Design a protein with these regions (language model features):
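Non-ligating segments of multi-cofactor redox enzymes
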Residues: 1-187, 195-198, 202-224
């Protein structure tokens, strides 16, 4: 069951990751292709009202790209504190929207110019994300991604991870988390509500006690 959950996630990511390089390449050839980036932006924020940052799991091509190409479960890296900085995230959000907004304003009415604004943004931020993935953490960019930040704000408290009392606090769930989060530290409260949780289920698959679930009643039944 656990392996099937991970395999299912892998298969979904295998279907979406290639969209990232495909859109970048297509965008430089045919700039209007850059408008596809809007779908990812709208999807991430729209879905957050119902299930938090779940879009960032496998539906986001860039998130899938980073997981498949840079994630190594045997060498999990801790997420540095500066990537959790609210000021840095707010700065990135403001910077991206100002830069993108300015380019769209200057090229308004020109589909090629407006499309290229999205292509440039996608290309530059992906390169930054690759550097962070190699040097800092595979999902480093995801911690400062403007859409991810908005999704974490709007999706706060949505679809929490329930922790049954039989949790031993072994920390295997935290080691398996692609975002570098630490669910086991909230065992006393019985809920993990970090807004950066992408609801991927890696933690539930890693738990030897089956004490974690995104469905409260199911958790209690499994861990009983």
């Amino acid at each position: 069951m656990k392996n099937s959950l991970l395999l299912n996630r892998y298969r979904k990511q295998a279907l979406t990751w290639f969209i990232l390089p495909a859109v970048i390449i297509a965008g430089w050839i045919y700039p209007p292709a850059g408008f596809l980036l809007l779908l990812c932006m709208i999807g991430a924020v729209g879905l957050s009202f119902f299930s938090g940052r779940s879009w960032c799991d496998w539906m986001c091509p860039r998130g899938a790209f980073f997981d498949l190409l840079f994630q190594n479960p045997r060498q999990s890296k801790p997420v540095p504190s500066w990537l959790h900085s609210k000021k840095l995230r707010a700065f990135m959000l403001g910077l991206i929207f100002i830069v993108l907004g300015t380019q769209l304003y200057l090229s308004w009415g020109d589909l090629y110019g407006m499309g290229m604004a999205f292509v440039r943004l996608l290309t530059i931020t992906t390169l930054i994300g690759i550097v962070l993935a190699v040097k800092v953490h595979p999902r480093g960019w995801c911690h400062i991604c403007p859409m991810g930040t908005l999704a974490s704000w709007f999706g706060k408290g949505k679809l929490p991870l329930y922790i049954h009392e039989k949790c031993t606090g072994c920390g295997l769930c935290s080691k398996a988390c692609p975002m570098g989060l630490t669910p086991h530290r909230d065992k006393e409260t019985g809920e993990f509500t970090d807004p950066d949780c992408i609801k991927c289920g890696s933690c539930t698959s890693a738990c030897p006690r089956t004490a974690l679930s995104f469905t409260k009643t199911v958790t209690a039944q499994k861990a009983a």
